[in-house]
Amino acid sequence: MIILGIDPALGSLGWAVVAKETAQLKYLASGIIRTNSKDAIHHRLAFINSTLEKVILEYQPNMAAIEETFVNTNSVTSLKLGYARGAIMSLIGRYNLDMREFKPNTVKKTVTGYGHAEKDQMLHMIKLLLSGTALITNSDEADAVAIAYTCLVTKNY
């Protein structure tokens, strides 16, 4: 089972690929997709879509796991995040991948044991739980690993 974990965002999207081979979890890859805030939104969404598509084609995941969105007090920010999620979900659908969504607190609790863990705690635990993640320093990337990890350990596939 290969899971593509996604921490959705318009400016800095985290992605990660984690596999379950027999009883072992294996980190395969992760990264950040950054868009320029000066670019038109449709160009930013197209860039996210095409870059994430390359990840899907390279790693051939069986499923995508994505963090659920919380509604921000800033409606413009929430709307832009919704655009990014829509572009991502459209791509997931185009490749006929199953998809699971996880609340941020569920991911934090699964990884750290505490549903309100801070970013640095998440990053620390990901490095302990999955070998190969030692060089990850970006919290968006670590969150994507954590989302894929949560999908696999909760057997939500």
UniProtKB/Swiss-Prot annotation:
Mg(2+) 2 binds at E67. It comes from the Bacteria. One of its GO terms (biological process) is DNA repair. The keyword Oxidoreductase does not apply. The keyword DNA-binding applies. It catalyses: Endonucleolytic cleavage at a junction such as a reciprocal single-stranded crossover between two homologous DNA duplexes (Holliday junction). Homodimer which binds Holliday junction (HJ) DNA. The HJ becomes 2-fold symmetrical on binding to RuvC with unstacked arms; it has a different conformation from HJ DNA in complex with RuvA. In the full resolvosome a probable DNA-RuvA(4)-RuvB(12)-RuvC(2) complex forms which resolves the HJ. This is Crossover junction endodeoxyribonuclease RuvC. The lineage of its organism: Bacteria, Pseudomonadati, Pseudomonadota, Alphaproteobacteria, Rickettsiales. The gene is ruvC.
